[in-house]
């Protein structure tokens, strides 16, 4: 297929040198657009290592070449259609800002695992920690993880006909993959979590 940014890609070509070339081209594309960072040769080395780790770990189970890919890096941007998501702020100059809470982001990969089930896959290169508490993220904590739940909510917007989603967060350097199951009945709790955070932010007077 033809990528919008780096051109033609031979999806059936698994040659090591060719795949390294693709990694290099993608690395060049992103680093050339992130000029505020001082990129070092070690950064490219790490990127290559992590990509090949995805290809090889678990006998290639999470290698996208072995999956039925629905979409790579889908972007989501949608308003939360709830009354509580409305906001209105008056700025110092008298300007009134009104609207609704919007959620936006990018998901690493969506795959079709069959029987009407899609899998949302998100890779992490860092540690499996809750940075707010410094404690390790367990399966129970991941079930309540706002990011993963927001990904599920976003995918219901992107793929409304799909009822069941698996969400896999893959800590490639700290514990491997953790897969959770989300369905439509989980959405009310997800919206309540988002509402609680949104209202906390709305009620914050300093800083504004």
Feature map (PLM): residue ranges:
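Metal-dependent nuclease catalytic regions and adjoining charged, substrate-binding loops involved
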Residues: 10, 115, 140-145, 150-208
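A non-catalytic, helix-rich entry segment at domain boundaries
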Residues: 1-88
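Short, structured helix-loop boundary elements
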Residues: 44, 48, 100, 188-191
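A structural signal for short, well-ordered beta-strand segments
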Residues: 72-74, 109, 167
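Non-catalytic protein-protein interaction segments used by genome-maintenance enzymes to assemble
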Residues: 77-148, 152-155
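Short helix-to-loop capping/linker segments positioned immediately adjacent to catalytic or ligand/cofactor-binding
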Residues: 38-39, 59-62, 96-98, 135-139, ...
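Short coil/turn segments at secondary-structure junctions
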Residues: 35-38, 42, 93, 135, ...
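A general secondary-structure signal for short beta-strands and their flanking turns/coil
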Residues: 67-69, 100, 104, 164
């Amino acid at each position: 297929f033809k990528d919008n940014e780096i051109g033609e890609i031979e999806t059936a070509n698994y040659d090591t040198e060719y795949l390294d070339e693709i990694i290099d081209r993608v690395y060049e594309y992103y680093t050339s657009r992130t000029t505020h960072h001082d990129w070092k040769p070690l950064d490219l080395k790490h990127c290559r290592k992590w990509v090949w780790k995805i290809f090889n770990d678990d006998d290639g189970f999470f290698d996208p070449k072995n999956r039925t890919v629905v979409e790579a890096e889908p972007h989501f941007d949608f308003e939360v259609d709830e009354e509580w998501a409305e906001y209105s702020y008056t700025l110092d100059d008298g300007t009134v800002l009104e609207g609704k809470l919007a959620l936006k982001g990018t998901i690493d990969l969506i795959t079709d695992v069959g029987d009407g089930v899609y899998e949302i896959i998100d890779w992490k290169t860092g540690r499996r920690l809750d940075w707010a508490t410094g404690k390790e993220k367990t399966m129970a904590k991941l079930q309540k993880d706002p990011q993963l739940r927001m990904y599920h909510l976003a995918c219901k917007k992107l793929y409304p006909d799909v009822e069941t989603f698996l969400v896999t967060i893959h800590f490639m350097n700290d514990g491997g993959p953790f897969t959770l199951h989300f369905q439509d009945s989980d959405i009310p709790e997800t919206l309540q979590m988002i509402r609680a955070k949104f209202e906390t932010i709305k009620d914050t007077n300093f800083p504004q």
